[in-house]
Amino acid sequence: ADTWIFITPCYVNAIPGDAVEVLAKLHQAELSRNKYVYAIAQGGMPYTHTHHCCIGNIELFAKAMQLRWMGGLVIGGGAIIDGVTLKRLPNAVPVEHCLQKLIACTQHKTKVDSLLSKQAEMKIPGFVARLMCLKMNHTIHKQQKKIKADRHICFYAKEEKHARKG
């Protein structure tokens, strides 16, 4: 195939280790340099800018292998890779349109518009985002109280302190 499309889940600042391993094996195989490379990264955060590092990692890989980097699409706001249909995503309509545009780019071997991910992004009003953050913080603090954790002291710092004593 003369076109590679990498589809990977994305954590806040990295692609999974298994995906990195696949990229490393492809790099070692030194396959043909005349490949077109596209990427789709999916993460749970609704804002796509939190997942651009994944597309960036694949772009760096493509450039290191002297492949033709053609761009990618970041999909945020829900699971797609776990087999849930697109229609169940909260931002299903814009994501579907953006995927169609990406497919057209792969068929015509053209670059993906860098603003495509922004078009797929969920539009969350500021006050709703604030409410979501307050709810998330409340839930975290409630869980910390349940396990009697001091939220003002870093849990890992406490572990390190005990490790030095023992």
What does each of the following model-derived ranges do?
Residues 1-66:
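Helix-loop-strand module that forms the ligand-binding subsite of alpha/beta enzymes
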Residues 3, 8, 48-50, 85, ...:
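Residue-identity detector for threonine
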Residues 5-7, 15, 40, 55-58, ...:
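Weak global preference for isoleucine
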Residues 90-166:
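C-terminal and late-domain segments of enzyme folds
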